[in-house]
């Protein structure tokens, strides 16, 4: 179908439509064939129809829709265990969408009246409220199921849904559920009218509705990119929205938030294995033992209690991890997934619709629990549910957890939450009403809700997961429908930088390159960032060229110069790297890293005599550096300065006798001098220390042969004697 070959489409559709035994679908297929036949007859008769192209595209689109509808009918007929089919079959066909919306509106209106009217008989009023709440809940579940499992909408159904969104009587929470049901329905099959409803919902003044609609819209557009190529009205509507700076900003933010949610597994693993264990080690969490035995021994000898220091160290580390967790949360990471993922077994979550409910204390399942809490405890948890940065799904989980831990557990948890607050701070928290959420918070937390559904719902495998890592990344370059967004330089740049920070380097490069960097000084940053991403990918030659372009445009950038030197060294272009490290040393002559890197470049080029002064200077700056001593001794060996090399290697051995390399390096000095008698025991000791590892013998042979080959120019030992010495060392002669 994607090739837009109508004859082939009709031939493929026929057995599918016939299998449904649905007369309406069969007649629809015949109508499409007849229309196409009429169009072809006009063409062969030489009649020029200016609408031919539009009619053809419309036929292609309708053929797609017919295929979707036929597949849906067959699914309902044959897949009885599918949650979609089960939900569809439990709904009464004679109850229309309009009827459901009308009844739901009546419940909403009654609840508003009961809340606003003073009633002396409070018990009767409360009974009425509960009765209407349960009726509202039942109707909302039916509405969700009807919309999710619906066929393509008629014009009247679209108008009914839109009227519900525009109705001031209907609660915002109920409208949110309608938007989520529409989003889920679009995952099952493309429906232009449902997609248009999301466009309309984005324009509503309530942020809870507009942001939820935007997320659903982006998921649907991404999934149905190919279909939308035959939908000029959808393309036109999206392009029109792209003229709105607020829409563009919101859309790019959702791209980042959706992309970040793909990293939730990584974030959860860090929370489980690093952040939470470290925080729990703090004395504030009654943890006192950390197994720092060396510190224990040292402090005990001096008479101090080691627990004092352990607790202080643990508190410091915990504070750092709490700060890190806060920074992750501020950036948009889903840090609570690992905590609440174990709390989705409540019967409440057996209903698909409940995964998409905005949290509300009025829901019967929640009201029953919160109503049984004590006075201050109830206030504390109520405030927490207002302030905590939890998504709605996690707020439900938290509430259900309260019902399981009992009164004592509730009081203990309440005290732990408020223990660090002063009386005034606690009073302010309890008295402050719910603050208005920002658009970014609403969309992020809704995306968290979606992520939980598509990964934790028991039958989640029956749904197309938009967070699946096998799908393209969340970038406007991945789908044609998002092309109008690419005209916004600053937003594209921000998204590219986001991808770069998150290690999604190819998409970052593509976005940077879309900005068409020119060889002018104003674009130096772009060339630097492209080079950085290319270097991270291991594309060293391309990274070098990007860095070189940036350097030519601005030779005063130390950052560019450092990366030019680094990528040259990494690419083993040592002569170029030497030049760049010297330029860095000209500006910072005592920089140890630059001294060592330049010396390394010279050694790789066998310019040992030029490397020696650099290594002497490095040792002067860091006299205890074993690395510099070994490198200097190696250069001296190659220059025939055997006494100096032996002295340095001997010094290293005296302080690092437990390291095989210390014995091996000194043995090489004697090997270069041809003194096998002195070399053998040192080689043998290195071999015995190294051979305990699995690959120790093979690694020693590789090291010996490499050293032997490198020392050949200054050694008189031939290959046969070298092999004999190696065999003797391995056999322990």
Model-derived features with residue positions:
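TPR alpha-solenoid repeat register
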Residues: 213, 491, 525-526, 560, ...
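Alpha-solenoid helical-repeat scaffolds
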Residues: 354-559, 563
């Amino acid at each position: 179908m994607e090739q837009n070959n109508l004859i082939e489409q009709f031939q493929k559709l026929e057995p599918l439509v016939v299998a449904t035994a649905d007369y309406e679908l069969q007649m629809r297929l015949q109508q499409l064939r007849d229309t196409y036949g009429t169009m072809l007859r006009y063409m062969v008769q030489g009649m020029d129809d200016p609408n031919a192209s539009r009619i053809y595209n419309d036929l292609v689109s309708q053929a797609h829709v017919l295929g979707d509808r036929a597949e849906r009918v067959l699914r309902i007929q044959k897949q009885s265990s599918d949650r979609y089919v089960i939900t569809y079959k439990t709904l009464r066909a004679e109850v229309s969408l309009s009827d459901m919306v009308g009844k739901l509106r009546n419940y909403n209106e009654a609840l508003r009246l009961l809340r606003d009217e003073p009633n002396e008989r409070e018990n009767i009023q409360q009974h009425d409220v509960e009765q209407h709440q349960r009726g509202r809940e039942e109707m909302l579940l039916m509405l969700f199921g009807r919309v999710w499992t619906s066929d393509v909408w008629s014009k009247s159904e679209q108008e009914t849904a839109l009227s519900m969104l525009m109705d001031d009587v209907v609660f915002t929470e109920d409208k949110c559920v309608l938007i989520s049901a529409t989003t889920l329905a679009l995952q099952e099959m493309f429906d232009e009218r449902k997609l248009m409803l999301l466009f309309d919902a984005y324009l509503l003044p309530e942020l809870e509705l507009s942001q939820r609609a935007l997320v659903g819209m982006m998921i649907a557009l991404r999934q149905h990119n190919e279909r939308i190529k035959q939908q000029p009205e959808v393309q036109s509507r999206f392009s029109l929205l792209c003229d709105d700076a607020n829409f563009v900003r919101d859309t790019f933010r959702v791209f980042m938030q959706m992309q970040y949610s793909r990293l939730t597994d990584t974030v959860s693993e860090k929370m489980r294995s690093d952040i939470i264990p470290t925080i729990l080690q703090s004395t504030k969490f009654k943890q006192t033992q950390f197994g720092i035995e060396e510190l224990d021994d040292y402090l005990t000898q001096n008479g101090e209690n080691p627990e004092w220091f352990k607790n202080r160290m643990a508190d410091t580390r915990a504070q750092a991890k709490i700060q890190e967790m806060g920074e992750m949360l501020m950036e948009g990471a889903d840090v609570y997934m690992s905590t609440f993922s174990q709390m989705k077994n409540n019967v409440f979550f057996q209903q698909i619709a409940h995964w998409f409910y905005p949290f509300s204390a009025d829901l019967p399942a929640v009201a029953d629990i919160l109503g049984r809490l004590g006075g201050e405890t109830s206030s504390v948890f109520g405030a927490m549910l207002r302030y905590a940065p939890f998504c709605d799904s996690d707020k439900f989980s938290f509430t259900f957890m309260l019902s399981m831990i009992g009164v004592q557990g509730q009081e203990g948890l309440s005290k732990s939450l408020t223990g660090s607050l002063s009386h005034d701070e606690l009073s302010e928290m309890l008295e402050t009403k719910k603050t208005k959420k920002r658009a970014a918070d609403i969309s992020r937390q809704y995306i968290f809700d979606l992520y939980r559904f598509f990964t934790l719902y028991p039958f989640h495998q029956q749904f197309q997961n938009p967070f699946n890592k096998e799908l393209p990344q969340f970038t406007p370059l991945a789908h044609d429908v998002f092309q109008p967004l690419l005209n916004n330089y600053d937003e594209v740049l921000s998204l590219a930088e986001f991808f770069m920070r998150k290690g999604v380097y190819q998409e970052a490069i593509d976005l940077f390159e879309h900005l068409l960097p020119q060889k002018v000084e104003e674009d130096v940053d772009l060339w630097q960032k492209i080079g950085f991403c290319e270097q991270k990918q291991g594309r060293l030659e391309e990274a070098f060229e990007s860095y070189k372009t940036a350097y030519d445009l601005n030779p005063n950038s130390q950052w560019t110069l450092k990366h030019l030197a680094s990528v040259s060294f990494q690419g083993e272009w040592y002569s170029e790297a030497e030049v760049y490290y010297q330029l860095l040393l000209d500006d910072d002559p005592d920089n140890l890293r630059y001294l060592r890197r330049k010396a390394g470049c010279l050694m790789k080029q066998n310019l040992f005599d030029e490397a020696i002064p650099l290594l002497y200077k490095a040792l002067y700056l860091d006299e205890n550096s074993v690395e510099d001593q070994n490198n200097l001794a190696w250069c001296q060996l190659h220059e025939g300065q055997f006494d100096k090399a032996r002295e340095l290697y001997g010094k290293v051995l005296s302080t690092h006798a437990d390291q095989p390399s210390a014995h091996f390096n000194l043995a090489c000095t004697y090997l270069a001098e041809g003194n096998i008698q002195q070399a053998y025991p040192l080689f043998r000791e290195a071999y015995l220390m190294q051979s305990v590892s699995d690959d120790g013998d093979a690694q020693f042979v590789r090291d010996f042969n490499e050293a032997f080959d490198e020392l050949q120019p200054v050694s008189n030992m031939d290959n046969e004697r070298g092999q004999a010495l190696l065999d003797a060392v391995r056999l322990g002669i």
